[in-house]
Amino acid sequence: MDQTEQGLRFRQIHLDFHTSEAITGVAAKFDAEEFASVLEQARVNSITCFARCHHGWLYYDSKKFPERIHPHLANRNLLKEQIEDCHRRKIRVPVYITVQWDHYTAVRHPEWLVVTADGRFSGTPPFESGFYRNLCLNSPYRELVKEITAEVLETLPVDGLFFDIVIVRECACRHCIDGMKRQGMDPADREDRLRYAVQTLNQPVVGWFAMVI
């Protein structure tokens, strides 16, 4: 795509696409040409499409994380085709990547979840519906987000990144407690937990954006 045209585009759509594994036939009838043509007719000039949703599923043909591709994604080139056909019509496609909500990871790695001061996991309880379990960016989960982001940038012609759910959350997990102690902070002090949470959030986000620049 010609990247010489600068400036923020305002005919923008956010195509929310959080898709449960219980849904089958995802993108089975997707027609990239029709998709982009409809956007062009509506004079859309930018649309956010999904690489990764809150359920933790991927919508591109990941080689690094094939187990995370949506189990019922009929067209593994969904995101690639969305981008390419939009580009043919001069439509930009920034790509969505969830950060602190990822149900797939939360279920398989509870040790990466944010822990509250009273020792509970932060977010949706185990037997309630929803994917709002908060993952801690001071855990090894940080590297996972980085690797997924790197793969998206390396394999797809994206026009930008939309990192969602990037929120300061005080945490008392072992990773945060150890980190606070190393900096001379008091993990039992809420103000110290909040200060450390800001650091925990800023460091990886700056690094991810540096990958784009």
What do the PLM-derived regions correspond to, one by one?
Residues 1-57, 84, 89-91:
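N-terminal structural segment of carbohydrate-active enzymes
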Residues 144, 166-167:
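Conserved active-site carboxylates
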Residues 14-30, 60-77, 126-146, 186-201, ...:
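The substrate-binding groove and active-site-proximal loops of carbohydrate-active enzymes
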Residues 44, 157-161:
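Proline-aspartate-enriched helix->loop->beta-strand connector
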Residues 87, 91-104, 162-166, 192-213:
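Aromatic-lined carbohydrate-recognition surfaces of secreted/lumenal glycan-active proteins
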Residues 40-76, 101-117, 126-127, 170-180:
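Aromatic-lined carbohydrate-binding/catalytic grooves of carbohydrate-active enzymes
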Residues 39, 86, 93, 145, ...:
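Conserved, mostly hydrophobic/aromatic
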Residues 95, 99-156, 195, 200-203:
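Active-site-adjacent "subsite" loops/lids of carbohydrate-active enzymes
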